[in-house]
């Protein structure tokens, strides 16, 4: 029984470690992807909007 308990515990610890590593990798990948996508989308939208506004103001002034 002692040996069985030990192996078990070992398999459980291995499963937990693998699960934790996978979850961490997934969360990191999701965060990185989300940040990159959000940043690129926001940057493009903001840049385009600011450029249009700036060009309109310049054209009106000139």
UniProtKB/Swiss-Prot annotation:
<keyword id="KW-0217">Developmental protein</keyword>
<comment type="similarity">
    <text>Belongs to the protamine P1 family.</text>
</comment>
<keyword id="KW-0539">Nucleus</keyword>
<feature type="region of interest" description="Disordered">
    <location>
        <begin position="1"/>
        <end position="62"/>
    </location>
</feature>
<dbReference type="GO" id="GO:0035092">
    <property type="term" value="P:sperm DNA condensation"/>
</dbReference>
<keyword id="KW-0226">DNA condensation</keyword>
<protein>
    <recommendedName>
        <fullName>Sperm protamine P1</fullName>
    </recommendedName>
</protein>
<dbReference type="GO" id="GO:0030261">
    <property type="term" value="P:chromosome condensation"/>
</dbReference>
<keyword id="KW-0744">Spermatogenesis</keyword>
<dbReference type="InterPro" id="IPR000221">
    <property type="entry name" value="Protamine_P1"/>
</dbReference>
<comment type="function">
    <text>Protamines substitute for histones in the chromatin of sperm during the haploid phase of spermatogenesis. They compact sperm DNA into a highly condensed, stable and inactive complex.</text>
</comment>
<dbReference type="GO" id="GO:0005634">
    <property type="term" value="C:nucleus"/>
</dbReference>
<dbReference type="GO" id="GO:0003677">
    <property type="term" value="F:DNA binding"/>
</dbReference>
<dbReference type="GO" id="GO:0000786">
    <property type="term" value="C:nucleosome"/>
</dbReference>
<keyword id="KW-0544">Nucleosome core</keyword>
<keyword id="KW-0238">DNA-binding</keyword>
<keyword id="KW-0221">Differentiation</keyword>
<keyword id="KW-0158">Chromosome</keyword>
């Amino acid at each position: 029984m002692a040996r069985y308990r030990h192996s078990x515990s070992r398999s459980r610890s291995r499963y937990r470690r693998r699960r934790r590593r996978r979850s961490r990798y997934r969360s990191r990948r999701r965060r990185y992807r989300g940040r990159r996508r959000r940043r690129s989308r926001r940057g493009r939208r903001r840049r385009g909007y600011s450029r249009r506004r700036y060009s309109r103001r310049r054209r009106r002034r000139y």
